[in-house]
Amino acid sequence: MNIRPLRDRIIVERIEEETTTAGGLIIPDSAKEKPQQGIVKAVGKGKVLEDGTVLPMDIKVGDRVLFGKYAGSEIKIDGLEYQIMREDDILGVLE
């Protein structure tokens, strides 16, 4: 990936959800919602505070994260789709 996010921004690759339910029903594309979790692919240096100090990021590359349905912006890099969002948009890290 040839992009480095600035400040407190994070690039996330969405994790696609299952297309079949536990009961074996196939979910059509028209009924699917965008997944709200993904893998962190790149992180910025951190948030710059008013006094000029940089608050380091709690999130690191490789973390599996949860985020809101409308968080961030969709971008396309090298033909792949990603979300770019601020660290504040991340709701939690799955461990």
UniProtKB/Swiss-Prot annotation:
Matching SMART domains: Cpn10
GO CC, any one term: cytoplasm
GO biological process entries: chaperone cofactor-dependent protein refolding
Main location: cytoplasm
Subcellular location: Cytoplasm
Gene Ontology MF: a single term: metal ion binding
Pfam families: Cpn10
Coiled-coil intervals: none
Keywords: Chaperone, Cytoplasm
Domain of life, source organism: Bacteria
PROSITE patterns: CHAPERONINS_CPN10
InterPro entries, per the entry: Chaperonin_GroES (IPR020818), Chaperonin_GroES_sf (IPR037124), Chaprnonin_Cpn10_CS (IPR018369), GroES-like_sf (IPR011032)
Family listed: Belongs to the GroES chaperonin family.
Function: Together with the chaperonin GroEL, plays an essential role in assisting protein folding. The GroEL-GroES system forms a nano-cage that allows encapsulation of the non-native substrate proteins and provides a physical environment optimized to promote and accelerate protein folding. GroES binds to the apical surface of the GroEL ring, thereby capping the opening of the GroEL channel.
Known partners and oligomeric status: Heptamer of 7 subunits arranged in a ring. Interacts with the chaperonin GroEL.
Protein's recorded name: Co-chaperonin GroES
Source species taxonomy: Bacteria, Pseudomonadati, Thermodesulfobacteriota, Desulfuromonadia, Desulfuromonadales
